[in-house]
Amino acid sequence: SVQLANPDLVGLNVTIPYKEQVISYLDELDKDAAAIGAVNVIKIVRQKGKTRLIGYNSDVIGFTQSIEPLLEPQHKKALILGTGGASKAIAYGLKKLGLECKFVSRNLREEMLTYDQLTPEIMDEYKVVVNCTPVGMYPRADEYPNIPYQYLTPNHLLYDLLYNPDTTLFMK
């Protein structure tokens, strides 16, 4: 195991696509990670000859602290692009900030919208759009999520979780 091979290891990060799958290997979840259903940080605790793995989700903290100062009175509802582990943390954080959320997926699912269902009325109703997909990430930086950009206004707030490249086409 990793713990035996690296006795000095005290923790590690988890990224897509493993944020949800890793939960079954953990001994404990912090309350936010349990509510979100996704983990991106694992703390390794060694006590009395036993090793315990504890899962946390720091995505929600980083996201809410960075988006909260950008929110204005018209930002009451958010579209969340993607349905993976990161999107769950984003929805959890936005709800804590008082926003109503709707997921957008490529595939038709209950309680979600597809990209084809993003009408002018929906885009007008949901003034915050958060990209939680890998679309537009290096090395495919020439791509962007398939939303109707023509319906965006200066009252919209777009937020991209991707960090490579620094500015994605979604944000331009």
Where are the regions that the model predicts?
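Phosphate/diphosphate ligand-binding glycine-rich loop within oxidoreductases
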Residues: S1-L70
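Short glycine-/small-residue-rich Rossmann-like dinucleotide-binding loops
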Residues: P17, T133-V135, L162-Y163
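Short, conserved loop/helix-junction motifs that constitute active-site signature segments
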Residues: P73-Q74, K95, I122-D124, N146-H156
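Rossmann-like NAD(P)-binding element
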Residues: E121-E143, L152
